Amino acid sequence: MNSLRDYNDELKDNEGRKYNYNFDINVMHHYMLKSMFPFFKDGNLLELGSSMGIFTERFIPYFDDITCIEASAEAINMAKKRFKEKVNFVHSLFENVILDKKYDNIIMTHVLEHLDDPISVLKRVNNEWLSDNGRFFLICPNANAPSRQIAVKMGLISHNSAVTEAEKKHGHRKTYSLDTLEQEAKDAGLNVIYRTGIFFKALANFQWDRLLETDIITKEYLEGCYQLGQQYPDLCSSIFLVCEKDKK
């Protein structure tokens, strides 16, 4: 990350995009955790980029030892009010942080696309922070989500992997697909043991937010979108890798 960036400002909603949609918090966070849970290891947890701690809260029942690294001081202050002493927060850039132990579970959710030099940070995960038998959970927005492909056909976005102006204001640097995400993980020395998508998604986040205010969408429909996403990972809202240290 670039020390000249204003990470507090990047958290703010802008005219083209909210930073957090209800769809993210109430739907995607549930299915992200559901996707990760079978792969959790016993031990501690490091979350890379915790923002205000909204997703962090879902890990409390599963881990007693949680550390979060976050670049935004404002986000950390809000998160500390939420968790008190339950979570250890470190205000730092990933490039600069010094950690005094290794972690059995490391989670990075919708953060890698914000980094100026993602491979260097992934190398730190592999070489410095991940325990020998630990697992790294990496989730990013998907360039090939149908909602995004439809936006391209509508002329709203130039191409699937484009970074929109609204995304740039939120600090996005690139938009990953499964192949580009996996390649960067491998370039950093990580061993990808599992890959999938999370939640088939044909509507934009703001459209989902409107639908969720009605009785049109049922829990069964949401579960159906999740299950369909397992069959068609390249057409999901998010893409997901589980990685371990390369044993070679």
Positions of predicted regions on the chain:
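Conserved N-terminal segment of class I S-adenosyl-L-methionine
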Residues: M1-K101, N105-T109, L122, G197-I198, ...
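S-adenosyl-L-methionine-dependent methyltransferase catalytic module, highlighting the catalytic core
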Residues: S3-Y7, G16-V27, I54, E74, ...
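Short, isolated positions within intrinsically disordered regulatory regions of eukaryotic proteins
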Residues: S35, F59, S131-N133, L212
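A short helix->loop->beta-strand "cap" motif at the edges of active sites that frequently abuts
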Residues: D64, N133-G134
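A generic alpha-to-beta junction signature in SAM-dependent methyltransferases
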Residues: F83, W129-D132
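Short catalytic micro-motifs in class I SAM-dependent methyltransferases
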Residues: H110-H114
